[in-house]
Amino acid sequence: MFKDRKEAGERLGRALENYRHCDGIVLAVPRGGIEVGHYVARHLDLPMSVIIVRKLPFPDNPEAGFGAVAEDDSTYFHEKIYDWVPFHKIQDVIERQKDEVKRRAKIFRSGSALPDIAGKTVIVVDD
């Protein structure tokens, strides 16, 4: 599909040309999304920041996920998960991933808060 993340970001930037110089921001999801987002933001002449989200992996199959958590502590998953996985295991997974989100936010943004996105066009980039 793409030779590398640089090419992906440059092509995505061109595809989003209508957003050049808008009142917007590129939010990149680590790790690979940072490189792609860099080239998108550069092409569109927009600021870029990093947003941390984490998959909620099934306790017995960490490659598969049943939801996600974000930096604002929002958690998204289908309630049917309780039919398959005990409540305490789900809560353990959620707490571990929330801790990891906080740890990564400190690393990737050096402790800085997410930028204010109210009223802005937000372009979320992942690889």
Predicted regions and their residues:
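PRPP-associated nucleotide enzymes
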Residues: M1-D126
